Amino acid sequence: NFMIHYLRRFDKHCFTVQLHDKTYTIGEGQPLFNVIINKDIPKKELLASTSLALGEAYMRKDVEIQGDLFTALRCFLSQTGQFSLDKSLFKRILYPSESKSAQKKQVSSHYDLGNDFYAKWLDPSMSYSCAYFKNEDDSLEQAQHNKVHYILEKLYLKEGMTLLDIGCGWGYLLIEAAKKYGVKGYGCTLSKEQWKKGQERIEKLGLQDLVQIDLVDYRDLVAEGRQYDRIVSVGMLEHVGRSNYPLYMETASHLLKDGGMFLLHYISGHDESIGNPWMRKYIFPGGTLPSLREIVSLAYDDEFQVIDVESLRRHYYKTLMCWFNNFQNVRDEVIAARGEEFARMWD
């Protein structure tokens, strides 16, 4: 069977496969999980893109995991060098347009799924980026609060300063900055749902004089002629697109006053790879993970002086596990509202 033959390349960890009433063992040792194949995955799909073929098969329940899904994912994703990928078949997914109109649609497809959906499994602050766990027993809500205030401390804010948040999400960081430091905050987003929720929060807290959020592309901010004492961008760079990185850094440089500070928080990749086709099709259309070296290089090209670099890798692992557990707690609600295939996609 080609499916079994193909899966044998992932033998770094031991697991079993059930197919046509037979059980096969792959790798040596004690099996960590069991892959149940309810329907064969076509050979051409596996050879075209392993991640897309396996991901879509899981969504359809053609493939199920008996045991811990996270362990299974770690097993396969630690062996991505064995994945097949015919780039010529997925040009629209791997090399999408990075124009303003295209990226607006890409952002909307993910962030405009509805505030009710994200509220089910994010913490009350609606922070959708890596948290910061000061203590082992910090809750997700506390860790997200820690993260935002850690960022604000690094920016050395003072009352009366102006703060720009590029890709401000639901506005939590700007609101906290205004409340604690009395700064004037301005945020931009391409998500109508985020903008709507952000506006509601600002009005509820009576912060209209200090915080403003607009539905606008960061590339249009320079034309407004304003500059800021501080700029922050959290979890937005991943949506910019590799061809736009130079423009993004140049834009930040233009928008920052002389002597100002820019804090950039993002998910980094080990290298400049094009990414995972399944993730780019279903979760983050147009999403790309920049490497640290390319962003640092671009920063110096735009006359930034890099004074601090910090990896939050271990914190992101904990953040993801918190989100996963929260999602599992409301999974039945998600299935009732959006169907099982959608829920399995988000598993």
Predicted regions and their residues:
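A short glycine-rich, Lys/Arg-flanked "PGG" loop and its adjoining helix->strand segment in the class I
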Residues: 246-258
